[in-house]
Design a protein with these regions (language model features):
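Class I S-adenosyl-L-methionine-dependent methyltransferase catalytic core
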Residues: 1-197
């Protein structure tokens, strides 16, 4: 399924594609090449890189658009491939989430592959020339882990502070968020879904 971000009469007539200046995505990465391949699949359906690349995200990106893409370090090559497939150019790491335990606020450590992992990164890529609205947004996010793979809510706030209150969508969303259109299999979508084929 892919986002159908069109507005109109709902019957196919007079419809235009909704364009977004911010796209925030936390893809359900499939770790087929890794020994922990079943870990994510225990919690939610995953997608192969080919399936992710086939999503028509470029169609919903405005002329000037910022993409914020969560990636894990083992999936970094796939994340960079996905950025390009969606029509964006990699710029930097926007946010580094340093994970804490929920109760004790000590550092949380996952299993990792070579070293015990703690951090997760959100990459920033652009299409066109989106403008930064604030120079005071910090890269570090120190926040407790929640349910599997759920990202800190404050990241959305940082994105809006950085880029402004512009049309925005969260792909693979896990919750409704005021001011954001959402699309994903864990939320009631604010956009219609269009099936391929």
């Amino acid at each position: 399924m892919i986002p159908d971000c069109r507005s109109g009469d709902g019957k196919g007539g007079g419809r235009t594609i909704q364009k977004y200046q911010i796209i925030y995505a936390d893809p359900p990465w499939d770790y087929q090449q890794c020994r922990l391949s079943g870990s994510a699949k225990k919690h939610y359906p995953t997608m192969r890189i080919e399936e992710l690349c086939a999503l028509p995200v470029a169609e919903i990106a405005d002329r000037d658009c910022a993409l914020f893409l969560w990636a894990t370090f083992p999936q970094l090559p796939e994340a960079l491939r996905l950025i390009q497939a969606w029509g964006f150019v990699y710029k930097t790491v926007a946010f580094v989430w340093l994970k804490q335990n929920r109760k004790a606020l000590t550092w949380f450590y996952g299993l990792g592959f070579w070293t015990r992992r703690n951090a997760e990164i959100c990459l920033l890529a652009t299409k066109g020339h989106p403008k930064r609205q604030s120079a005071g947004i910090h890269q570090l996010v120190i926040s407790p882990v929640e349910r599997h793979s759920k990202k800190p809510n404050e990241v959305r706030e940082k994105i809006v502070a950085l880029m402004g209150d512009v049309p925005r969508i969260e792909l693979f969303a896990r919750q409704q968020t005021p001011g954001w259109d959402v699309w994903g299999n864990e939320v009631e979508n604010s956009t219609a879904l269009l099936k391929e084929g």
